Amino acid sequence: MAKKVVAVIKLAIQAGKANPAPPIGPALGQHGVNIMMFCKEYNARTADQVGMVVPVEISVYEDRSFTFVLKTPPASVLIQKAAGIEKGSGEPNKKKVGSITRAQLREIAEKKMPDLNANDIEAAMRIIEGTARNMGVTITD
């Protein structure tokens, strides 16, 4: 018989830097999950993406066991890294903070494809382009 899911927890954690301190500890602790086991597994599976924020969806079962699915890093983080900026613009319609090329845009869209609600790479590129525009990042050819 399949195990019954009692909770689904969504967190965005720095890759390779999960520790039992808040926000991870309290979020998992209230469901009785072994926090250290989660931290070790998460850090091992994200060791190749250090420096990125990697969202994770944790399913907690009745017997306090858990499974988790890693998502792709947020588009905004990927855009910031590509443009070499610290953060997006406070007023994107007036002040531009950086720019990325179409090739970089395509690369980000390909990386985000599994988590985007898009059927082809062109649609994914339009979604990422919108995110970039809202951050004050211009797209150059």
From Swiss-Prot:
GO terms classed as biological process: translation
Keyword Phosphoprotein part of the UniProt annotation: no
Keyword Ribosomal protein in annotation: yes
One Pfam family recorded for the sequence: Ribosomal_L11_N
Keywords from the UniProt entry: Methylation, Ribonucleoprotein, Ribosomal protein, RNA-binding, rRNA-binding
InterPro entries per record: Ribosomal_uL11, Ribosomal_uL11_bac-typ, Ribosomal_uL11_C, Ribosomal_uL11_C_sf, Ribosomal_uL11_CS, Ribosomal_uL11_N, Ribosomal_uL11_N_sf
PROSITE patterns to which the protein is assigned, alphabetical: RIBOSOMAL_L11
PTM comment text: One or more lysine residues are methylated.
An example Gene Ontology molecular-function term: large ribosomal subunit rRNA binding
One cellular component term from this protein's GO annotations in UniProt: cytosolic large ribosomal subunit
Domain of life where this protein originates: Bacteria
Subunit record text: Part of the ribosomal stalk of the 50S ribosomal subunit. Interacts with L10 and the large rRNA to form the base of the stalk. L10 forms an elongated spine to which L12 dimers bind in a sequential fashion forming a multimeric L10(L12)X complex.
Record-stated family: Belongs to the universal ribosomal protein uL11 family.
Function field: Forms part of the ribosomal stalk which helps the ribosome interact with GTP-bound translation factors.
Protein name as catalogued: Large ribosomal subunit protein uL11
Gene of this entry: rplK
